[in-house]
């Protein structure tokens, strides 16, 4: 592998569980209970097209979406849940390994670039990424491959030499469509049969990705 492309939420940072709690809290403020399958539909996607059926069944959904977006950019909000930081196990060690071995890496997130930069500021140890690609930088989000292809292009690496690290179904599908290798690290989403068919590698955490990279060299 000549580079690593990282998803952000749920992969680098333990934000998905907090986001679900946040959605539930905001929903209740509107007198609405958020269904569990809505979280599966929204995880790893750029826009709200995947939520189209829910706009008919979940009252005030647009208001809930708007309120959640505002909170996502609030560092104090994240710090209230994780005073010691949001980073997932192995993030710092893997990032240092990539840096020491001169392997380029890029964050490729469905979220806006500004939001990714907000989360990076929560880490006590500075992380090195050669670039950040946000969902606001491409026309089509995951499961389309645009985000990963742009990341590879910025790093100057051919798709077949890229390893994508993902925790979502849409991200795994996007990696497959980009012609890249993928490693799934489970967070809140349990793989279904379709997802299993597209997962090339699977590890418990980012720390184990170091061993995978050693094997692939």
Predicted regions and their residues:
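Asp-based, Mg2+/Mn2+-dependent phosphohydrolase catalytic module
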Residues: 1-2, 96-99, 112-113, 117-217
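Active-site neighborhood of HAD-like aspartate-dependent phosphohydrolases
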Residues: 1-40
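Short beta->alpha linker loops
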Residues: 18, 46, 86-90, 111, ...
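An amphipathic alpha-helix signature
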Residues: 20, 24, 36, 47-52, ...
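Helix-loop "lid/cap" segments that line or gate small-molecule binding pockets
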Residues: 26-27, 46-61, 119, 151-152
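Short helix-capping segments at alpha-helix termini
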Residues: 29-33, 57-64, 124-128, 156-157
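Metal-dependent phosphoesterase signature
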Residues: 54-96, 101-103
């Amino acid at each position: 592998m000549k580079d690593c492309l990282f998803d952000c939420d749920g992969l680098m940072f333990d934000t998905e569980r907090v986001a679900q709690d946040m959605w539930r809290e905001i929903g209740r403020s509107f007198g609405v209970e958020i269904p569990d399958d809505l979280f599966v539909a929204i995880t790893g996607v750029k826009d709200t097209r995947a939520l189209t059926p829910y706009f008919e069944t979940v009252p005030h959904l647009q208001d809930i979406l708007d309120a959640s977006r505002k909170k996502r950019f609030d560092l104090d909000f994240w710090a209230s849940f994780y005073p010691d930081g949001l980073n997932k196990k192995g993030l710092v060690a893997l990032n240092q390994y990539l840096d020491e071995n001169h392997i380029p890496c890029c964050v490729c997130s469905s979220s806006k670039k500004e939001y990714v930069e907000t989360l990076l500021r929560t880490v006590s140890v500075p992380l090195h990424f050669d670039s950040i690609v946000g969902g606001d930088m491409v026309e089509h989000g995951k499961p389309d491959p645009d985000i990963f292809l742009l990341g590879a292009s910025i790093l100057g690496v051919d798709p077949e030499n890229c390893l994508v690290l993902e925790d979502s179904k849409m991200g795994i599908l996007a990696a497959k469509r980009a012609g890249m290798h993928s490693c799934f690290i489970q967070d809140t989403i349990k793989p279904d049969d379709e997802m299993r068919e597209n997962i090339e590698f699977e590890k418990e955490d980012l720390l184990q990705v170091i061993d995978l990279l050693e094997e692939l060299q």
